[in-house]
Structures are given as C-alpha cells and as structure tokens.
C-alpha cells in the first residue's frame, strides 16, 4: 500500500498505526508527483491525492489532508493551513502568521481536523479525526511538525511538547487512522 506523502513525520505516524501492513512512501514507490490540493474540504483533497496516486501505481493508496480550524476566524485557515502563505514558507513562518492573526482574539479555540482516505480503484473509505484545543501565543515544544508547536490541548501541552507515543494517542491523524483501520477491518 502506498502512502501519498514523503513527509517524514506523517509517514512515521502512519507506519506506527498500520504496522501490520507493508507501506511505501511516494519516494519508495518511485512516484514523483505533486497533486494540486484545490478542493474545499479535507476529504476532497485527500481523495483527489489518493486517486491520482492510484492511477499512476494501480496500488492501494492512503492519503490524508489535515489542518487547523480556528473557531472565531470562521474555521480559517482550514484546508489552506499548509498553503495560505505559499508553498515556499516554513512551518515556523506559517505558525507565526497564525499566531499573529489570532493576537486580538480572546477566544483562541481551534480544532485540528484530519481526513484519511483509502482508495483501491473501486472502494473509497474515509477515516476522520478531530481534536479540540486552542492556538498558543507563542510556539512551544520540539517534537512534531507542521502546526504542532502552536496547538495546545486541554491538558495545557502543545502537540510538539508530547513524545511520539503520547501524540499518537491524541492526535487527529491518529484518531483518523484508527477510524480508517476499523472501517477497513
């Protein structure tokens, strides 16, 4: 099965959950393609990627899309979390821009939403995970990637302040993977 990603952090998380299946990254499958994530839902982006990779490989594919939805900003940045500043920006630059956008908000409540799609050319199965928390006032933590350093859980820690085992128990991707795995079994 192919994971429609080369993101090392994402691959590690997925391989830890689906540890009983042989999984390949795009690089390991010798696939070099960028799929334009232009859909207006996480599900739409994940499905588009999964179908594109399947068409090239004819192998079962799992693909995900995720992002932060800030309640008081009408769920911004949502599906644009990784792209709202442009593809050439770092995680830190994006995170600082999100913090800046939230600076005047009294309520910084947010959700991380993750949709993971399995596609085999005929069957489409989606797993969804959602976690609630808030946007921090500054980045915190060294573990993780993406927006992990600015998303604070109800326990007061950011996702980046958790070790990988702790994060795997609470992350939206973990919840989506478990949901997907249960639906596939």
Predicted regions: what is each one?
Residues 1-2, 9-185:
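Anionic-ligand binding patches
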């Amino acid at each position: 099965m192919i994971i429609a990603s080369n993101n090392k952090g994402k691959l590690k998380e997925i391989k830890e959950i689906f540890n009983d299946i042989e999984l390949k990254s795009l690089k390991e499958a010798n696939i070099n393609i960028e799929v334009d994530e232009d859909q207006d839902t996480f599900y739409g982006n994940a499905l588009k990627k999964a179908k594109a990779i399947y068409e090239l490989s004819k192998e079962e594919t799992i693909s995900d899309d995720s992002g932060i939805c800030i309640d008081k900003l009408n769920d911004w940045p949502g599906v644009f979390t990784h792209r709202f500043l442009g593809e050439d920006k770092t995680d830190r630059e994006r995170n600082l821009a999100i913090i800046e956008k939230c600076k005047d908000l009294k309520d910084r409540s947010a959700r991380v939403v993750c949709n993971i799609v399995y596609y085999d050319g005929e069957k489409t199965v989606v797993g969804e995970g959602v976690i609630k928390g808030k946007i921090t006032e500054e980045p915190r933590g060294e573990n993780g990637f993406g927006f992990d350093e600015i998303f604070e859980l109800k326990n007061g820690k950011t996702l980046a302040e958790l070790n990988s085992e702790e994060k795997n128990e609470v992350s939206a991707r973990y919840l989506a993977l478990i949901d997907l795995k249960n639906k596939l079994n």
